[in-house]
């Protein structure tokens, strides 16, 4: 019997990961600016290092679920759909 699905290729995983980073980066930056918060301000509220916020906003870091929740609560904004 044939499998009903295929495992994703490395290229598909890399593409999905990059798209997710872009969605998260845009969401964090837009939500933060809408609240007129600096990266430092968001970092202080969320209990996250400012460099981490910067790396997330620039798409250079994939945050953990815990970090996403901290940011979401701090921005009073729902985490966007990633895939």
Predicted features along the sequence, with ranges:
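N-terminal flexible/basic segments that precede or flank functional cores
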Residues: 1-30, 34
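Short alpha-helical elements of helix-turn-helix
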Residues: 26, 50, 65-68
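Short basic helix-loop element that most often maps to the first helix and adjoining turn
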Residues: 26-41, 45, 70
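Residues in the helix-turn-helix
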Residues: 41, 52, 81
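Recognition helix of helix-turn-helix/homeodomain-like DNA-binding domains
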Residues: 47-62
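DNA major-groove recognition helix of helix-turn-helix/homeodomain DNA-binding modules
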Residues: 64-81
């Amino acid at each position: 019997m044939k499998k009903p699905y295929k495992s994703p290729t490395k290229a598909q995983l890399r593409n999905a990961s990059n798209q997710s980073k872009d969605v998260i980066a845009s969401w964090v930056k837009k939500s933060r600016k809408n609240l007129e918060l600096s990266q430092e301000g968001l970092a202080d509220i969320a209990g996250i290092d400012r460099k981490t916020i910067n790396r997330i906003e620039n798409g250079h870091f994939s945050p953990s679920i815990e970090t996403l929740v901290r940011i979401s609560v701090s921005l009073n904004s729902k985490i966007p759909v990633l895939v």
